[in-house]
Structure formats: structure tokens, C-alpha cells
Regions:
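Bacterial N-terminal signal peptides that target proteins for export
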Residues: 1-11
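Short hydrophobic alpha-helical membrane-anchoring segments
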Residues: 18-23, 608
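N-terminal leader/linker segments that initiate helical-solenoid repeat arrays
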Residues: 22-69, 76, 85, 230-233, ...
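Gram-negative and organellar
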Residues: 29, 72, 101-102, 118, ...
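Inter-helical turn/loop elements of alpha-helical hairpins
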Residues: 47, 78-85, 523-530
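Mid-chain, structured segments of secreted extracytoplasmic proteins
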Residues: 64-105, 109-111
Length: 802
């Protein structure tokens, strides 16, 4: 700005000086004034010289060459746009050779190659004896990508008259622009010989090697200049990422060396060399990303992008750092800036895909990965090889497209895609790992373990395989083994997000676990079986694993109701031990109840996963928690013996049959059974709709003869829907709203059948891996001995690892 203001004042003073002189004096001294301005430029007073020439033009003082000299000075001063503007305004039909050369170079500097070539051809015609014109025309044609024409121009007699070194430099430039490195180096080598090692010629030759990423070769030709040293450091960055030691502990050696070199160059660089400093910082940004020093990379990217747009290679590194640092919106924007310039950039497209996944934008994620997959050919072919070869990039993209469905909770579609890929390429470790993940998600631990072990067998040193084996150990309650394997990974890969997540998960599994549920309610109706104001609450506290397979636990329950006979309550406390091995869990616990009735009790449970699809459960409990509260007012209790069999096809479909036998102390014997079928009807990202059909029946030997609700025989047939919608998710934290509604028929012997129903709405918060919290409201309609009871209830639940 200061320079512009200074130039404006100089121009104003020059105009005033000229305006104050007699007109005939100005005309008589135009040439002298022009030449005086040129002399000022030669003396280094470029701004003053340009201002004087502009003032002469503005005052009409011109000998026909003022504009031409101004064009020349502007081009020499690095102002091609101004030079072209003056040249075009002058519209001189026969500009002198020096001005024509300057205008041609100005057009070339602006990338207006057609205009530059037009002027160069005009110069060739007007000044056939001047060899600068064929050389300049050749350079312009090379810049325009018309290298064959450029080489033809250099073969003309006019070009042959040029100085050999100048002609060879033009030819070398043409070959360089054509991408023929060998021919360019051959020509430049001859130019170096003829020029007796001229440094300028050596620098031109070194540029060829810099173009092809050979800065050490460039240094051998031209010496270690700062730009070449910068290129060497950039090459070290690329090699550090591409060529890594097989030992994981040394995988960053090359990148660390590159960072040290860049830091040294930046420390020694003069502050005024801003262009090279920015280039070194851009390379350093990439190196920081490769070294997974992501916070530093993000901060460097923030600073560099504030100074101007980033080139694609740096924008990619910046986006990767932003994604790592959990700034997915900014990462998406960075990748999109790359794609705006290069829509087919594969790295940027994968980055945009992962950013969309983190943002729960699965419409964009699916579209991105599916398009990328479709554009990858199934086969690759190579020159002089008639055979077709598998394209590994296609396989990777197809696997990632399947995993996208896994991320979107569409496990069925993900599984079908992956099985097809695995059947076609059974030795693909990446696909096997993806199968492991989805099998885990579908609740198939045996299949998951099988896939993890296959993947580890195919690539035992692969980080993903090693993580999978640790997860298998955790799921099998082999916590000590998992900790040992995890310690090895943390020592080698402390920066890896998957390793960090695994450490958090293992830590969570080895903590205390508190589970609490509270359900207050208020009922009206129900006749003599009305519950009135009521509460059901229960809590369990589990210890951390003991010797991997054991846990101690304490339990506490408290319930109350207000039947017609009055207030009744039951408190229960107990403690027990849980034993867990793969596929089997068993517990045993004694209890003590107090309140309306004081009595000891206890129980035992066993759950056996016979296969990935079949689960058998059994339980026995003395003074069962299912004893009706109203019965306690009369000193009546019940034991319970129950069994359940479940068949799960997968996470979206299951059928279960249950049986329970409750002998009461008053002689009543209750037998109950049920059948439940569930199937997910709609499964899209962020939303699931599950249908449920249930049949339940019971019989009591003292039906209708007890002081508690005790139908002789009853049957309920209910159907319902459960809608689950992810309202918000941010990495480990999420909020889901769930609405369930069911209705059906209830039939009781001796009474008219009636309809029953339940409507429940709740919020579920998750702060993985430690906290789950839910709360909701429920409306129920039930029928007892022909009387309808309506209930308003609330639910609060907490699952907290401590």
C-alpha cells in the first residue's frame, strides 16, 4: 500500500511538472525526457522512471516510444498485467523490437500463450536476423504444451543462428515440458559443457531433476542451494511415509529425520525468504501428519491456511489431522476443497467418506464410497502383458463400502457384501477383519473369533489383526492375556486411535459396574387388584473381574404398592458370585428380605450359548422376586423355577420360548409359558423399526381362591412395534429416542375378553464406554378379573462403570 501511494504521488508531481512547462518545450524535449526516465530506471529508480513515463502519456508528451519504454520497464519490474495493459492501449502497429520482446514475455508471464505466440511470430517476420524470436517462440509453445511445435521451431535456420547455449537451453526446456527427462538431461548436459559449467545453465539442468523428485541429483549438478535443500527435505518426508522399516518400533525413523531436517532449514532460513519458508512449512505439516503428531499438524494447518489456500497435498494432511482431532466438519471442508479442484482425488474422497461417517451423514458416506467403488476397474492390465490381474484397489473399496453399512448399523447388508467378497478372495485379510467386526455386531462370538484368527494367520504383524485378537480375549474374559497383548501395542503404537479405544474398553471392563433401575407408577381401576401408587426398584453392584472369570456382586431391591388392603413393601438385599467363561455364565446368591414380610431367600442362574444362534437359560429362586406384593400381606410367598430357550438368527430376528413354575406357600401352583418373536422391519442409518408378537398363558391350581390376583387360566396375544431413532451422536456419545407401542387381546377364564396395550417413550443416553442412562414415561392398560386398570409409569435406569 505504501508503495502504491508513493507511486501515485510521484505520478502526480510528474504530471504537475509537465503541466507547468510550455507546450512547445514539452514537445521539443519528449525524447530527452523519455531517455532521462530510462536512465533513472537503469540507476535503480524504477518507480520514479515509470511514473515519469506515465505522466508523459497522461500529458500528451510523446515521441512515439514513451509507451513502448513503459511496457519494457513494467515487464522488467515484474508487472506483466500493467505492461500488457499499456501495450494494448498504445496499439502501436510497428513496435520496436525491444518493446515487442517485452510484451511477448509479459503475455507469457500471464499465461496468455496464444497472444505471446502471435507476437513472437510477428517478431520473427519483422526481425528475421534476430535469433531471439525463434527461441522465444519455442519457449512460449513449450509453456502452452505444444512441445512438438516448439522443437520444430528450433530446427529452423533462424534458430540455428542463435548462440548454441541459448538454443540448447530452449531445446532442453521443450523436452522438460514434454516430460522426456532423458532427452532434456542430454541437451542440458551439452549446454553445460559448452558454457563451461555456467551456474545458470547448471540450475536449469537441475530443475529437470527437481521435476522428477531427484533433489540429490540436482544438488550434484547445481550445488546445494536453499531451494534444492528444501526439495531434499520434501523428498525425505515422502520417503519417510512410503518406505518404512518392517520393525514397528522404527516405522517413524525416516519421518523423524525429515522433521529434523525441516526444522534445521527453517531455523537457518532468512526471514525475507517467505516463499521457501511456506514451502518448508507445508512439507512439515505433511511430516507431522505422517508422524501422527496430529495436534501439531492441526495447529500448523490452521496457521498456514490463515495465510492463504493450501495446495492439495498439504490440504490432505490438514484434513487428516482435523479428522483425528475430532473436528469432522472442518475435515470435510478441507477434503471438499481438494475435490473442488481434483474431483477424482482418491485420498480426498476416502477422507470425505470418513468425515461423513463421523458426522453420521450416511447418505453422503454411501454415495461417496459407492461412486468410488464403481469407478475402480475390477481388473488391471499392464503394458506388454496380455493377462488380466486383480485390482486390489477395487477390493479395498468394495470392503470399505460394506463397512460403511456396518458403520450405519445395517449389519445384514454389510454381512452379505462381505461374505460375497470373502468367498471370492478367501485370503484377503482386510475382508476377514471386516467380517470379524460385523460378526461381533450381529452377536455371533464364535464366528467372530474364527474370522479374527484367520485374519491374524494371514497377517500376524498387522495392527488390525492384533487388535482383533485382543478384543476376542476380552470377550472371552481373558483379561490378563488381553492386558499383556495390549501393553505391547501401546508401547509400539501409542498414537493409534484404535489402540487407545481398546485400552479404554479394557479399562472399562475391569471396573466396578453399577446397574440401577427405578419404576414409579400410579394406577387407577383394577377393582380389588388395584396397585395404586407403586414402585419397583432394583440395583446391582459388580466387582472388577477376579482371576478373570469371577465377579462378586451385591444386589438390592425395593418395591411397594397400595392395594385395597393397605400399604405393602418389600426390601431385599443379597450378595453373590458370578462365574463367566466363553459361552457360559452362572451365578449363585443368598438374599434377605424385610418390610411387610421378613424372610431369607436366594437363587441361582445359568446362561449357556450353545451356538452363536441358540441360547439356553435356567434359574431357580427361593422367595422369588416375582412373588405378588399383595400376597406378602397374608404371609404368602412363592419360589420360582424358570427356563428359556432362544434362537437368534441375527440381531434382526429371534424367537424365544419361556417356561416358569411357581409353587406358592398357600398351596397354589402356577405354571406359565410364553412365546416371543421379534423381527426388525426397517433398518436404515439412525432409525430402526422392530416388530414383536408375543403369546403368554398361565394356569393356577387355586385360581380365583387366593387374596392376590390369580386367574385360573389366562391368555394374552400381543403385537407391537418398537421405533428407535438416533437423535444425536458425537463419537462416543449419543442420544436415542425410542417409542414402543403394543396392543392385543387378554382372555381370562370366567371373564369377558378385553384389549390391553402399552405405550412407552424413552430417551437413552450413552457416554461410552462408562455410562448409559435412560428415562421414560409409560402408559399401560391391563385387565384383572374383568376390571380395567390404567397405569402411568416412569422409568429411570443407569448403567455406570466406576
Amino acid at each position: 500500500m505504501e508503495r502504491a501511494l508513493r507511486g501515485s504521488w510521484i505520478l502526480l508531481l510528474a504530471v504537475l511538472a509537465l503541466a507547468g512547462a510550455p507546450a512547445d518545450a514539452c514537445a521539443q524535449t519528449a525524447t530527452q525526457q523519455r531517455e532521462a526516465a530510462v536512465l533513472k530506471a537503469r540507476a535503480g529508480q524504477m518507480a520514479e522512471a515509470q511514473a515519469l513515463l506515465r505522466a508523459m502519456l497522461a500529458s500528451g508528451v510523446d515521441d512515439g516510444l514513451v509507451a513502448m519504454d513503459l511496457v519494457t520497464l513494467l515487464q522488467q519490474d515484474g508487472k506483466p498485467a500493467d505492461a500488457v495493459a499499456v501495450f494494448e492501449k498504445a496499439a502501436k502497429p510497428d513496435p520496436p523490437d525491444y518493446a515487442l520482446v517485452a510484451a511477448t514475455r509479459a503475455y507469457r508471464d500471464l499465461g496468455r500463450y496464444d497472444d505471446a505466440a502471435r507476437l513472437a511470430r510477428a517478431g520473427t517476420r519483422r526481425f528475421p536476423g534476430d535469433s531471439v524470436w525463434p527461441l522465444l517462440l519455442s519457449l512460449v509453445l513449450s509453456d502452452a504444451g505444444r512441445t512438438a511445435e516448439a522443437l520444430e521451431v528450433l530446427r529452423t535456420p533462424a534458430a540455428a543462428r542463435a548462440a548454441p547455449v541459448e538454443r540448447l537451453l530452449a531445446e532442453g526446456y521443450a523436452w522438460r515440458r514434454a516430460g522426456n527427462t532423458g532427452a532434456a538431461l542430454n541437451v542440458y548436459g551439452e549446454a553445460i559443457r559448452l558454457s563451461r559449467g555456467n551456474q545458470g545453465v547448471r540450475s536449469e539442468a537441475a530443475g529437470v531433476l527437481l521435476d522428477v523428485g531427484a533433489p540429490w541429483g540436482a544438488a550434484a549438478i547445481a550445488g546445494n542451494t536453499r531451494p534444492i535443500e528444501g526439495q531434499q527435505a520434501g523428498a525425505m518426508v515422502r520417503w519417510g511415509e512410503q518406505v518404512r522399516a518392517p520393525e514397528p518400533a522404527r516405522r517413524f525413523d525416516g519421518t523423524d529425520a525429515a522433521l529434523a531436517r525441516l526444522d534445521a532449514l527453517l531455523a537457518a532460513l532468512p526471514t525475507d525468504d517467505k516463499d521457501l519458508r511456506r514451502r518448508l512449512r507445508l512439507d512439515r505439516l505433511v511430516a507431522l501428519r505422517d508422524r501422527v503428531r496430529m495436534k501439531e499438524a492441526m495447529e500448523e494447518g490452521d496457521a498456514l491456511s490463515a495465510d492463504g489456500p493450501l495446495p492439495a497435498f498439504a490440504e490432505q494432511a490438514y484434513g487428516d489431522a482435523l479428522l483425528y482431532m475430532r473436528r469432522p466438519e472442518d475435515a470435510r471442508d478441507a477434503y471438499n476443497r481438494i475435490l473442488a479442484q481434483s474431483p477424482k482425488d482418491v485420498q480426498a474422497r476416502y477422507g470425505a467418506f470418513f468425515a461423513a461417517v463421523e458426522l453420521d451423514d450416511f447418505a453422503t458416506a454411501y454415495a461417496t464410497i459407492d461412486l468410488l467403488t464403481s469407478e475402480q476397474p475390477v481388473w488391471r492390465s499392464y503394458r506388454n502383458d496380455p493377462a488380466r490381474h486383480d485390482n486390489p484397489e477395487r477390493g479395498y473399496a468394495e470392503t470399505m463400502a460394506a463397512q460403511a453399512r456396518y458403520y450405519g448399523n445395517q449389519l445384514g447388508e454389510a454381512w452379505d457384501r462381505l461374505v460375497k467378497l470373502s468367498d471370492a478372495a478367501p485370503a484377503n485379510g482386510n475382508t476377514r477383519l471386516a467380517l470379524y467386526q460385523v460378526a461381533n455386531g450381529r452377536g455371533w462370538p464364535r464366528r467372530a473369533q474364527e474370522e479374527a484368527e484367520i485374519a491374524a494367520g494371514l497377517a500376524p504383524r498387522d495392527l488390525g489383526s492384533r487388535i482383533a485378537l485382543i478384543e476376542v480375549a476380552i470377550n472371552a474374559y481373558r483379561f490378563t492375556e488381553a492386558e499383556r497383548m495390549l501393553d505391547e501395542l501401546r508401547a509400539l503404537y501409542p498414537e493409534d486411535l484404535a489402540v487407545r479405544r481398546l485400552a479404554r474398553d479394557l479399562d472399562a471392563k475391569r471396573r466396578w459396574l453399577l446397574e440401577v433401575k427405578v419404576q414409579p407408577s400410579s394406577s387407577d381401576g383394577g377393582g380389588t387388584n388395584a396397585a395404586g401408587q407403586a414402585l419397583i426398584s432394583e440395583a446391582r453392584l459388580y466387582s472388577p473381574p477376579i482371576a478373570d472369570n469371577w465377579r462378586l456382586f451385591a444386589l438390592g431391591d425395593y418395591s411397594y404398592a397400595n392395594p385395597p388392603e393397605g400399604f405393602v413393601q418389600r426390601g431385599r438385599a443379597g450378595g453373590g458370585v458370578e462365574w463367566r467363561v466363553p459361552w457360559l455364565t452362572a451365578t449363585v446368591y443368598p438374599t434377605q428380605s424385610w418390610g411387610t414380610l421378613v424372610k431369607a431367600g436366594g437363587g441361582a442362574t445359568v446362561d449357556w450359548w450353545v451356538t452363536d444362534h441358540i441360547e439356553l437359560s435356567g434359574s431357580a429362586e427361593l422367595f422369588s422376586a416375582d412373588t405378588p406384593l399383595r400376597a406378602l400381606l397374608f404371609g404368602i410367598t412363592a419360589n420360582e423355577y424358570a427356563a428359556k430357550a432362544t434362537y437368534r438368527w441375527h440381531e434382526s430376528r429371534s424367537v424365544a420360548a419361556s417356561f416358569a413354575y411357581l409353587p406358592f406357600t398357600d398351596g397354589n401352583q402356577r405354571v406359565a409359558g410364553g412365546l416371543t418373536y421379534k423381527e426388525r422391519l426397517i433398518n436404515i442409518p439412525r432409525f430402526d423399526l422392530t416388530g414383536r408378537a408375543e403369546a403368554y398363558a398361565s394356569t393356577n391350581t387355586l385360581g380365583g381362591l387366593t387374596p392376590y390376583y390369580n386367574p385360573s387360566q389366562d391368555l394374552s396375544l400381543v403385537g407391537g412395534l418398537l421405533a428407535e431413532h438416533v437423535l444425536w451422536r458425537r463419537y462416543d456419545n449419543s442420544l436415542v429416542q425410542a417409542l414402543s407401542a403394543d396392543a392385543g387381546l387378554y382372555a381370562e377364564q370366567g371373564y369377558a375378553s378385553n384389549w390391553i396395550g402399552t405405550l412407552n417413550y424413552e430417551h437413552r443416553w450413552r457416554f461410552d464406554p462408562l455410562t448409559e442412562f435412560r428415562y421414560g414415561v409409560m402408559l399401560m392398560r391391563r385387565v384383572y378379573d374383568g376390571s380395567v386398570e390404567n397405569t402411568l409409569g416412569f422409568t429411570i435406569g443407569l448403567r455406570q462403570r466406576i
